[in-house]
Amino acid sequence: MSLELAKAVGWQFFVTLWHVFPWLAGMGLVFSVLSFFTPCNPGKPWWRKDGLGTDCAYWIFVPIFTRYLRIALTAFATAAIFNIHDAQAIADFYQQGHGWIGTLPLWVQGILFLVVTDFALYWSHRLFHRGAAWKYHAVHHAPVQVEWLSAARFHPVNLLFGSVAMDIVMLLAGVSPEVFIVLGPFNTIVSTYVHANLNWTGGPLRHVFVSPVFHRWHHATSPRDKNFASTFPIWDLMFGTFHMPKGEVPQEYGIGEEMPEGLVSQLVYPLKA
């Protein structure tokens, strides 16, 4: 079994490379052009930033890790809650739909998924800025140069109690797998976009959808603990954490202390902090 698992993970590594490389190349081209004309913080281009190799490593590690974590936790939860144990039976169960959410049109399920998970992630995000949880989230905040590549920098513990947990809860609640197939890439695009070095505020939609400037204030060294929303700033407006002063952009980022470079070093960093 261990050999089969090793083969599966190895194969998934190459599959991930096959999918991620065109994505990185495309995003690199798009944001190189856009940030050349409208940079939020002029300076070194993204391909010369410190920690470039570590950023790229996260783009390989995170998809593989979250894929197997979602599969394992979904199988465990389905067996515990619905008493379904066979892999094919589990797949059929979710494809056929269940519960009242599963009876809704897919577009309604999609809206429900976006709103509920964004609200939950807002509070999860706030919790990761507190106490012992911060050292795991600090991995994401460590770069002093925030770029689109920074979007994938997340510690496994942060992922587990963030997007992975939200996805599994919504799947168990009855949201169709087809919704995840469509909105998974959408969420990745939004996350990549808001980390880009662009002086874009969203204009008249700045209170409706997140923007690069909105999220850069979240990464700023001052003020701290602002703009936690992943997609809809309404949560920050409702709970007093919205911060986008007109005509201003943040200049300094990071956590104010050294973060070891390299994927493995950062994965063990919270255990030593």
Feature annotation, model-predicted:
Residues H129-V139:
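Membrane-interface helix/loop boundary segments of multi-pass membrane proteins
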Residues L172-F180:
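Transmembrane helix interruption/hinge and helix-loop junction motifs
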Residues R70, T74, P156-V169:
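Core segments of transmembrane alpha-helices
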